[in-house]
Amino acid sequence: MTTLQQQKIRIRLKAFDHRLLDTSCDKIVETAKRTNASPVGPIPLPTRRRIYCVLRSPHVDKDSREHFETRTHRRIVDIYQPSPKTIDALMKLDLPAGVDIEVKL
């Protein structure tokens, strides 16, 4: 690496469904490869589990409870040496509604 800082786009993806997340990551990586950028990833981050404890009965039986959980899966994709063509292609990319995307330049 040179002393100059390289240009990099960091894309963070979050979703409840890991299959949807993986297909979105594959689309992003393929788009970056088509425009001659060098993608790194998808890098899996730890899955966050959120557990909710709810009473089963509205009146008595405090000991009877039910647990629900949501799992948030996360991935990072880094794209090095992006061109304006890469950025345009990523902006036009159609991704599912269940995937949350954050882009940092």
Curated annotation (Swiss-Prot):
UniProt-listed SUPFAM superfamilies: Ribosomal protein S10
Keywords for the protein's UniProt record, in alphabetical order: Ribonucleoprotein, Ribosomal protein
GO cellular component terms, semicolon-separated: ribonucleoprotein complex; ribosome
A Gene Ontology molecular function term of the record: structural constituent of ribosome
Pfam families on file: Ribosomal_S10
Record bears the keyword Ribosomal protein: yes
Keyword Manganese: no
InterPro entries noted in UniProt: Ribosomal_uS10 (IPR001848), Ribosomal_uS10_CS (IPR018268), Ribosomal_uS10_dom (IPR027486), Ribosomal_uS10_dom_sf (IPR036838)
Domain of life: Bacteria
GO biological process: translation
Homology family: Belongs to the universal ribosomal protein uS10 family.
Record note on quaternary structure: Part of the 30S ribosomal subunit.
Function: Involved in the binding of tRNA to the ribosomes.
NCBIfam families tied to this protein: PRK00596.1, rpsJ_bact
Record protein name field: Small ribosomal subunit protein uS10
Gene that this polypeptide is encoded by: rpsJ
